[in-house]
Amino acid sequence: MTDPAVPAAWTILELEVPAGSAEIVSDALWGLGVAAVEETPMSGGSVVLRANVSPLHDETVVELARRHGGVAKWVTVPVSVADTWRAHARATHVAGDVWLVPEWVEAPEGRTIRVEPFDVFGMGNHPTTVLALSAALDVVRDGHTVLDMGCGSGVLAVALSALTGCACECHDIAPQARDAVEHNAALNGVSDRVKWREGLDPGERAGYDVVVANILAPVLCEIADALVAVTKPGGTVVLSGLREDQTERVAAAYTGCDITDQRLDGGWASLTLCRP
């Protein structure tokens, strides 16, 4: 019998772009937090990219296609087709003995964080997630309070709490995020320390030892003042989701903060900032 709660089909993005633009467009899709990007070369010199993108990013995707001479459309496919990426999922090494592991994949030896991406979030295998987590692990300590802004599946908050004992709060505008956060927190035994919050209150000040945000660069700039405001004096802001050539612009938006660490991976970057 078919479970009525389980959809029979997914609506996924299909984006056709010139072959020369495929890599940068694919990187941009990964930056939106997708779980996978399928690339299919076409005979006319173009490439079709397919991904399960949150409807919240529809305008971003249309603009991305326009900017690179491509066309975006949404197609409906059976769940069995949309989920084929799961068969190719692998554990992702973060640092030391720490691994991020999809819930259905055999875990390697070491400290593992299990992740269920809920089909619209990443599995933790994108460089921006690895950069953010490795940088945050260097500054987060037991007893700290941490905000994961733009949390997606909650992988950063869950991992930080499980590995350090810190208390985390999570927020994301995606409607599926809360369920994903609560599922992954329970999956890793940290439901008592990882909590959902509805957003930042206007005028909110200085509540967190560490703020982590793995979001695209324009958004990091837009919310800079709010993130700094909720960080305790002497606290830390860890930023990821930006390209290497965007670091100066993003850092400049965090007025008065000093850069204490910068990491690079495949053209992506993270910044660790100290609030005065």
Residue positions per predicted region:
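General small-molecule cofactor/ligand-binding pocket signal
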Residues: 73-75, 101, 169, 195-197, ...
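Conserved SAM/SAH cofactor-binding pocket of Class I
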Residues: 119-200, 204
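S-adenosylmethionine
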Residues: 173-276
